[in-house]
Amino acid sequence: MFEHYLSLFVKAVFVENMALAFFLGMCTFLAVSKKISSAIGLGIAVVVVLTITVPVNNLILTYLLSEGALTWTGLEGASNIDLSFLGLLSYIGVIAALVQILEMFLDKFVPALYNALGVFLPLITVNCAILGASLFMVERSYDFGESVIYGAGAGVGWALAITALAGIREKLKYSDVPASLQGLGITFITVGLMSLGFMSFSGIQL
């Protein structure tokens, strides 16, 4: 069991990295990766959100939305009820609620990070990496334990990628980059090279 969870975690971090394998969450990934401090802060926020939302959405799917999930209520005909069509709406609602709570927490206790992240903190709500993790969980039929590990791994992988990109971009400020590639141009090339590097993990077998 431990080996299975370890394999799932490593796979989520390196082999199926949300940012560098699936290119999810690119908006905030590119916008907040100019400074390492901001990148780490947003990365931690994404880890927290993913670690909580994926298993919570798993519980919602298991006990409310999937066909026959409402049998525990004892209602007549509950075994035939299928609310899975509400999945997308439910997942987004959970993500939005958690991000709102996180935003209030940072505003109260870590105002410097809250101001540094600015508009990109509430944008975590529509970060497709967050929703994508929940949809992958559904597609792959993960149980609750696997959902916790996968959510944490996906968050750590995204945080690792944005922190690494931020470190490279800080170094690029002191490099002689051609004028036509300055800004997002060289950033896209950097992300592509990082993605190629992470592809080398695809052969890992645990």
Curated annotation (Swiss-Prot):
One of its GO terms (biological process) is sodium ion transport. Its EC number is 7.2.1.1. GO terms for molecular function: oxidoreductase activity, acting on NAD(P)H, quinone or similar compound as acceptor. Its main location: membrane. Coiled coil: none annotated. The chain crosses the membrane at residues 12-32, 36-56, 85-105, 118-138, 148-168, 184-204. Keywords: Cell inner membrane, Cell membrane, Ion transport, Membrane, NAD, Sodium, Sodium transport, Translocase, Transmembrane, Transmembrane helix, Transport, Ubiquinone. It catalyses: a ubiquinone + n Na(+)(in) + NADH + H(+) = a ubiquinol + n Na(+)(out) + NAD(+). It is found in: Cell inner membrane. It is an enzyme of class 7 (translocase). It comes from the Bacteria. One of its GO terms (cellular component) is Gram-negative-bacterium-type cell wall. It is a multi-pass membrane protein. HAMAP family: NqrE. Belongs to the NqrDE/RnfAE family. Composed of six subunits; NqrA, NqrB, NqrC, NqrD, NqrE and NqrF. NQR complex catalyzes the reduction of ubiquinone-1 to ubiquinol by two successive reactions, coupled with the transport of Na(+) ions from the cytoplasm to the periplasm. NqrA to NqrE are probably involved in the second step, the conversion of ubisemiquinone to ubiquinol. This is Na(+)-translocating NADH-quinone reductase subunit E. It comes from Chromohalobacter salexigens (strain ATCC BAA-138 / DSM 3043 / CIP 106854 / NCIMB 13768 / 1H11). The gene is nqrE.
